[in-house]
From Swiss-Prot:
Protein name: Pantothenate synthetase
Chain's gene name: panC
Other observations noted: The reaction proceeds by a bi uni uni bi ping pong mechanism.
UniProt cross-references to SUPFAM superfamilies, sorted A to Z: Nucleotidylyl transferase
Species per Swiss-Prot/TrEMBL record: Xylella fastidiosa (strain 9a5c)
Family according to the record: Belongs to the pantothenate synthetase family.
Pfam families: Pantoate_ligase
Length: 281
């Protein structure tokens, strides 16, 4: 049976007891409003660890001034039931005061240069600073052997991997595959913001990513592939932030070279909802 923990000393006591038993510990950080994509990360964690802690914390420092922090969906009871069903051992529910004892304005912040400044970093300044700050705190609280993050937030995964290397966290970082709806739309807590009319349109992002991948693999010029992706998405009603081809480390590829492994990434708004997705190849 899952145990819900809100006290840091209690959490550390549980983890210390696991350590004394020689058990391997995994962490799955989330912001709640969990869906099948999140639960797949917990199931992946169970393959690599004996015990799994999942955190639910809507982190204020990773939201910009005009983003959806206050209206971000919070579903604690459903989250707990779902986590218990997939075998999570501890649900860690820290308060803002626990995560930021000096307040969010005075807190020490972490910044990963270069990879944090592009793509999402351009459109959401300060976002990855908030992500790294809260993830590092979760690492110090749980002291996991393994931490699992979803590949839908691919840039976040790259940023966290760099942070772990640079700060010498003794933690293995795993990326969980994107879980999709039947029409290809990547599962996301923000999908519920879509109207009934917008929901079918949203699947065009995945179809566009497939077209981008196929065009690149057929030798298409990257700039032309990206421009066609933007045109296609705009024709479907999206306001496009970016549609790009990158190397797996998010470096920019050189036209005419073989990209392997590579990735196509899209961020676009449909109505009031901002969606991100990617496709590795």
């Amino acid at each position: 049976m899952i145990e819900t923990v809100t006290d840091l000393s209690r959490l550390r006591g549980i983890v210390a007891d696991w350590r004394r038993q020689g058990l391997r510990v995994a962490l799955v950080p989330t912001m709640g409003n969990l869906h099948a994509g999140h639960f797949s990360l917990v199931m992946l964690a169970r393959h690599y660890a004996d015990r799994v802690v999942s955190s639910v914390f809507v982190n204020p420092t990773q939201f910009g001034p005009h983003e959806d922090f206050r209206r971000y969906p919070r579903t604690p009871e459903a989250d707990m039931r779902g986590l218990e069903h997939v075998g999570c051992d501890v649900l860690w529910l820290p308060s803002v005061e626990t995560m930021y004892p000096l307040g969010t304005e005075r807190t020490v912040r972490l910044f990963v240069p270069c990879v944090s400044d592009v793509l999402e970093g351009t459109f959401r300044p300060g976002h990855f600073e908030g992500v790294c700050t809260v993830v590092a705190r979760l690492f110090n609280q749980v002291l996991p052997d393994v931490a699992v993050f979803g590949k839908k937030d691919y840039q976040q995964l790259v940023v966290i991997r760099q942070m772990v290397v640079d700060l010498a966290f003794p933690i293995e970082i795993l990326g969980g595959c994107i879980v999709r709806e039947s029409d290809g739309l990547a599962m996301s807590s923000r999908n519920q913001y879509l109207s009934m009319q917008e929901r079918p349109q949203a699947a065009e992002i995945h179809r566009t990513l497939i077209a981008m991948r196929d065009a690149v693999m057929s030798g298409g010029v990257h700039a032309d592939v990206e421009a066609e992706a933007v045109r296609r998405l705009e024709a479907a009603g999206f306001q496009v932030d970016y549609a790009v081809i990158r190397l797996s480390d998010l470096g920019e590829p050189i036209d005419g070279t073989v990209i392997s492994p590579g990735i196509a990434l899209v961020a676009a708004r449909l109505g009031n909802t901002r969606l991100i997705d990617n496709l590795e190849f």
